[in-house]
Amino acid sequence: VSGSLSGVDRGHLLTEQANPLSERLDELPTDQLVALFCANDLEPQRALERAAPALAAAVDAIAARLASGGRLFYLGAGTSGRLGVLDAAECPPTFCTPPELVQGVLAGGAPALLRSSEGLEDLADAGQRDLEERGFGPGDCLVGIAAGGTTPYVLGGLQHARSIGALAIALACVSADQVPMPCDIDIRLLTGPELVAGSTRLKAGTATKMALNLLSTGVMVRLGKVHGNRMVDVAVTNSKLEDRALRILRDLAGVSREQGRALLQQSGGSVKLALLMAASGLELAPARAHLARHGPRLRDALDVCGAQLSGSPQPQGPQ
């Protein structure tokens, strides 16, 4: 990967081409402009469906690495990098993961979240350097995110990941025929030309966010962070999340809010441990030991001790 791709004509890339549907965008009445965007924003979902085999392969490969002590890194610049940071930041509260398990690495660091630092994306060695500063190693996973597939910062990081035996996953919105990327798993979300030519924060950004939602959630399901469709490892850190935890206990274990609150207090805020205690009758110490031995999936831990959750899962409404 060269240190810079300055002077390269990217006009042939799918993400840079002009969309014929929006040639007169500036002349459209507002209602027609909105309708055009609504219709065009169906493309990210279709792109995701076409990429389903690669996404499934990525979920299984990442989950296997994380189950063996590895970590997941998202690497990107601009919108792509910000989306990676956003997804990584949601994992600790949703799945009670340590913040270092899933990390978003953005060209330019934290200041680039608020102020554009797109010039930094042209430095291929910067991607490798930012990963090395975080101790990125052979047991880890990298998802390199670049809508147009040509970002040197991301390509340098992917090349480094492959060179040390880490799992390298590319995520781009152009075809591999147009732009090959160094990777083990290649996710291509072909959303087509943007309504504002080249503005990949639009459809490409939407598809990227959807893919990251799927990857992180799928991995956490595989790691036992979800029972049925409930986030049984939710971090109880505020009133809303405490309420959600109490409703999970009510719906799955059939306990009252008062009983649920007592169980949460006994379990140190662990919903999964509280559910096991409610279903099995085990006290805290043996329940914790049982979960450590037979988890992390609650279903497996329950099966081993012959316990069943007495509640019937109820749909959770929007919060």
Which role does the model predict for each range below?
Residues 214, 219-319:
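Short, amphipathic alpha-helical interaction segments embedded in low-complexity terminal/linker regions
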Residues 73-211, 219-223:
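Glycine-rich phosphate-binding loops that contact phosphosugars or nucleotide phosphates
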Residues 2-47:
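Cofactor-/ligand-binding subdomain signature composed of acidic, glycine-rich
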Residues 44-53, 144-151:
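Short, glycine-rich nucleotide/cofactor-binding loops
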Residues 61, 157, 215:
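Aromatic/hydrophobic pocket-lining residues that form π-stacking "cages" and hydrophobic walls in ligand
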Residues 50-65:
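A short, well-structured juxtamembrane/interface segment
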Residues 15, 36-44, 104-115, 227, ...:
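Gly-rich Lys/Arg/Thr-decorated short loops/hinges at beta-loop-alpha junctions or inter-strand turns
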